[in-house]
């Protein structure tokens, strides 16, 4: 690096012009100079040099020790002629100067060449930047950072806000799962009874599509363990041991229609704590308070109201995850349309996507109780209040609204793709007709002329 700077300095036009009066040009490595220091020539010329305007600071590791060059001009005898002992460096090659004799010695007034100085500063800066970027800091291929995965539901499970059960021994747990699209309650009831569970048959007749089972040993004393199994494919466990829950889930696998993924089932669940207290049953700050003075049948009905809302929540969570997965599958279509690229989807695939959307929309809006209150609560105001409060806490209405908006957007996108494919098909048919007409005209012309 210092040798290149010296050769660059030697090639300057101003130094070459001033060197015609010198006998030799010596380059020495001396101690670092101060910011402003003067060098005196033997011919009486004093040049004030501002070092940091000509030599920018170099921060490379290989240039830790600054090397300052000092130019000593010694005036030669006017009667003797000497060639210029300097080497010019141009385009990376050495160029020796021509042997032209010097003229007679004349006193000259030296003026700083500002244009050459500016060029020298630019050259040094350009050379310094090239060294620091290429030689000292080699380029490295940085790995691409992947985006974090998006959350798969509109509302996170309520279990994240639950207090620890060990703090209050009276707290019991209610857990809801959605494992399939539908259960076969008849065969399921028979197998559970054969396994030692007790079926509760005291529910009203209008409480259809529900199977209530009692367990012998509950997780905590004070409330009997109860299991609510809905035909829609959801199970709600009240004060049931974890070992018992796993056994029931294994039994459910043999009576399911279109089961869901196990990981999705265990993630998209709902957990609420409940406690037996005096007074009216209610949902207060995410905690269910059951009236301890009620008899077993009334307590089962109140648990059914809470379980019904939890069943809707976990089913909606599964459908939210399904919709998010569908959105990820068509996420590349808007980007491809924006970039002007060709969308690689056939007409059959587009119609299949539309069928998935219509099926999901039908489940949410037509075959479930998300939009209206079930008929079971019309003449049971106290149970309807518990059901509505739980749905409000679980944000059922808002989540359904968000899902319908997403479905509408996906429907518009699939309609756009279907229209685009129809236009392409129509254009292809038009071109086929044009080609056929052209062939027919050519045959007619051949018949006429030949």
UniProtKB/Swiss-Prot annotation:
Keyword Protein biosynthesis: yes
General function of this protein: Required for mitochondrial translation, possibly by coordinating the assembly or maintenance of the mitochondrial ribosome.
Assembly: Homooligomer.
Protein family per UniProt: Belongs to the RMD1/sif2 family.
Protein localization: Mitochondrion
Species the sequence originates in: Mus musculus
Top-level taxonomy: Eukaryota, Metazoa, Chordata, Craniata, Vertebrata
Main location, first listed in the record: mitochondrion
Keyword terms: Mitochondrion, Protein biosynthesis, Transit peptide
Identification of the protein by name: Required for meiotic nuclear division protein 1 homolog
Keyword check for Protein biosynthesis: yes
PANTHER family according to UniProt: REQUIRED FOR MEIOTIC NUCLEAR DIVISION PROTEIN 1 HOMOLOG
Cellular component GO terms held in the UniProt record: mitochondrion
Transit peptide residues according to the UniProt entry: 1-5
Highest taxon in the source lineage: Eukaryota
BP-aspect Gene Ontology terms: positive regulation of mitochondrial translation; translation
């Amino acid at each position: 690096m210092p040798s290149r700077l010296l050769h660059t300095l030697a090639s300057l036009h101003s130094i070459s012009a001033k060197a015609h009066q010198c006998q030799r040009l010596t380059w020495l490595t001396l101690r670092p100079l101060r910011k402003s220091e003067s060098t005196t020539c033997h011919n009486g010329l004093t040049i004030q040099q501002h070092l940091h305007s000509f030599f920018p600071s170099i921060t490379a590791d290989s240039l830790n020790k600054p090397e300052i060059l000092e130019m000593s001009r010694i005036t030669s005898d006017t009667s003797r002629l000497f060639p210029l002992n300097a080497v010019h460096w141009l385009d990376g090659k050495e160029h020796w100067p021509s042997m032209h004799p010097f003229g007679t010695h004349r006193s000259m007034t030296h003026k700083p060449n500002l244009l050459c100085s500016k060029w020298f500063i630019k050259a040094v800066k350009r050379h310094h930047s090239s060294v620091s970027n290429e030689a000292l800091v080699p380029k490295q291929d940085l790995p691409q950072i992947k985006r974090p995965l998006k959350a798969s539901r509109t509302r996170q499970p309520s279990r994240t806000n639950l207090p620890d059960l060990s703090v209050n021994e009276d707290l019991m747990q209610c857990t809801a799962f959605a494992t399939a699209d539908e259960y076969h309650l008849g065969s399921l009831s028979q197998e559970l009874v054969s396994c030692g569970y007790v079926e509760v048959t005291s529910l009203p007749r209008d409480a259809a599509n529900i199977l209530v089972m009692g367990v012998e040993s509950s997780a905590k004393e004070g409330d009997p363990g109860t299991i609510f199994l809905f035909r829609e494919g959801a199970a709600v466990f009240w004060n049931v041991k974890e070992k018992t829950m796993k056994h029931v889930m294994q039994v459910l696998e043999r009576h399911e229609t279109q089961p869901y993924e196990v990981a999705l089932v265990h993630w998209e669940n709902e957990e609420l704590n409940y406690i037996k207290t005096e007074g009216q049953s209610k949902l207060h700050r995410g905690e269910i308070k059951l009236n301890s003075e009620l008899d077993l049948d009334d307590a089962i009905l109140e648990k059914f109201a809470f379980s019904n809302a939890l069943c809707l929540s976990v089913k909606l969570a599964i459908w939210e995850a399904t919709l998010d997965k569908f959105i990820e599958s068509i996420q590349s279509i808007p980007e491809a349309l924006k970039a002007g690229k060709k969308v690689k989807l056939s007409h059959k695939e587009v119609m299949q996507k539309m069928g998935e959307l219509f099926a999901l929309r039908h489940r949410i809006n037509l075959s479930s109780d998300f939009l209206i209150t079930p008929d079971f609560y019309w003449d049971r105001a106290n149970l309807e209040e518990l059901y509505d409060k739980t749905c409000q806490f679980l944000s059922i209405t808002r989540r359904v609204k968000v899902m319908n908006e997403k479905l509408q957007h996906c429907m518009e996108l699939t309609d756009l793709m279907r229209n685009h494919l129809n236009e392409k098909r129509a254009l292809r048919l038009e071109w086929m007709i044009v080609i056929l007409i052209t062939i027919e005209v050519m045959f007619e012309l051949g018949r006429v002329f030949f």
